[in-house]
Each structure stands twice: as structure tokens, then as C-alpha cells.
Amino acid sequence: QPPIARSMLQYRFDRLSGAERNAAAHGYRGAMFPWESGASGEEDTPVWALTGPFEQHITADVGIAAWNYYCVTHDKYWLQSEGYPLLKETADFWTSRVTRNGPGRYDIVNVVAADEFAQNVDDNAFTNAAAREDLEDASAAARVLGTAPDPDWANVAKNIPILKFPDGTVREYAGYNGQQTKQADVELLGYPLHAISDSSTIRRDLDYYGARIANGPAMTQSIYAILQERLGMPETAFATFEKGYRSHEVAPFDTISEVAGDTNVYFATGAGGFLQTMLYGFGGLEITPQGIVQRPTRLPAEWRSLTLTGIGPHLKTYVIRSSDQKPKAAAH
């Protein structure tokens, strides 16, 4: 539903000046969006929480969302007037945020990771990968508009490190050595980011971190289910998907709690994960610069078909059918 997506980005654009003030207050250029935004756009996170000043991947998330909206709608007027300003200012933030320690070592130090057990760490996998993608998206947006991108965006993007263990498993942050994690972090590099596409690396990361996740927020199982489906494991994906929402359902309205057995409802992030599993996992959808496309996908044996309606600006319907284990997909 592009109008709803646009309204969310409109909220960010209308508060861009507040994000610019926030960046300046921390000694950076560009825009630094708050972790918990007040109506004014100022940081509203309680002062005792480290997420406010340090969980800075939110800034990259805003930029990536702007580019995704353009990719779906191809609305150049919007990109020129609102999308590119968001992308430019968030990219400028990262060029000032990195510590330039030489080629391949433009480190992002002292952050709270997407895995919020990891606080005040350096070179967090998700933060670094999201910053890289934000910088690359800003350059792509500039080229769409016929504007020369700041060459430092590409320079910084290619020098932000993604750390790995000797066997190729992505390391969550500098010094990470197998500690328990709260929620998905490294796993996010395969989806929704595009930092890792190699199936063997994604599988290795899922196996390694899946054994280390605590009983955390509901959205983690959604990421695992999406990636498992994309790896050609529909039955494993279905079991993960079902676990992710069944264990978090709260009567009488079947709302989704933040943590299994918790009464903190309604947890919108968990509900969003449920929806994304249907669209980008079992539904096979993917946002690309050419628009929404559909990948080959397989349904679990428990389902005969899956119908997705009202997708994208043209309100397409996608039907995925399972027949003799040879599912078909069609768009109308």
C-alpha cells in the first residue's frame, strides 16, 4: 500500500530538520534520526536507555526505506522532493560517523547493535551493512535524478568492514566470541539487506546464531523463516514461522506479544514480521530497482495455495499454488 508507506516517510521528511539538529548535537553532519521519535522529531528515548544515542542503524533504516519506496513506485517527483533529501542527509551522516583507519577499516565504533544485548560495540554487522546499503542507495538515487553523487559515499561504503570468523561466518561485532544474542542481527544481512546473497554463508550464519538466540522478540523467527524458505527449506520455514506467532499469540484477540508468554501487546514489529514472512518468504516477492518481482518459491506441504492481493501501486494479485510438489506462481 504505497500511500501508507509514503505517509510513514512523510513523517520522517517533516522531521528532517530535527534529525539534522540531533546529528549536529552529537558532532556529526547530515541527519541522525532518533530511536524513539517525539512529535517534534526530537529524541524521546528515556535518558537511561543506551538505544537513544547509540542504536544508530535507525538512520540507515530510514534511508533504505526511502529508496525501497522509490523502487516500488518509480515516483521521480517524490524522489526529487522528499526521498533524495532523506537519502542525502542520512548518507552524509555516515561519512562523518565512520572512523577512517585506512583501506577496509572505516570503522563504526561504539554502537548498540540490532542485537540489543550488544551495547557499546564496534563494527556491528547489521549497523555496518545497513550504513553501506544506505550510502549505495543514496548514490543510486542521485544517478536516477541525473545528479552527481558525492564520491565520498562510494568511498566510505566500500571501506566499511563486515567482520568474519576464519570459517566465513559473519562476526556480529569486533570481539564477539559466541555470546548469547537477544534477536536477529547478522541474519539481517541476507534479508532485508542485500549484503550477503551466498546461500552457504547465509546457512552457516543461521546455524551459528540460531543456537545462540535467547527467548527474544517475535520478529526474529520471521527473519529465519524468510531465509529458510529462500534456501529451499519450506518445511523448516513453516515450522519456524508457526513457532514465531503461535508462541506469541495473546487471547482473546490473538494479538502478538513482544516475548512469548508476555502480556506486552500489541507488538507491531512481530506483526510486521508475520506479514513479511507471507510476502517476502512464502510469497516470493522481492523489492528491486525494477519494482516488485517474484522469485521461485515453494509452499510447505500444509498449504495448497497462497494468494496475495493488492500488491504494489498496480494492486496486483499473486497466486502461488502447490501441485505435486511443483508449485506455480502467477501475477494478475
Model features per residue range: what roles?
Residues 1-16, 64, 71, 81, ...:
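Active-site core of glycosidic bond-cleaving carbohydrate-active enzymes
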Residues 1-99, 127-128, 135-138, 267-284:
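Aromatic-rich carbohydrate-recognition surfaces in CAZymes
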Residues 20-33, 95-112, 116, 162-171, ...:
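Glycine- and aromatic-rich loop/turn segments at beta-sheet edges
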Residues 24-26, 79-82, 99-108, 145-150, ...:
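Short, glycine/acidic-rich hinge or "gate" loops at secondary-structure transitions
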Residues 35-54, 108-123, 251-263:
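Acidic/His metal-coordination segments adjacent to aromatic residues that form catalytic metal sites
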Residues 47, 228, 235-332:
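Non-catalytic C-terminal accessory modules of carbohydrate-active enzymes
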Residues 97-129, 214-221, 227-231, 268:
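Aromatic-lined, polymer-binding surfaces characteristic
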Residues 108-145, 150-152, 264-273, 294-312:
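C-terminal, helix-dominated tail/subdomain
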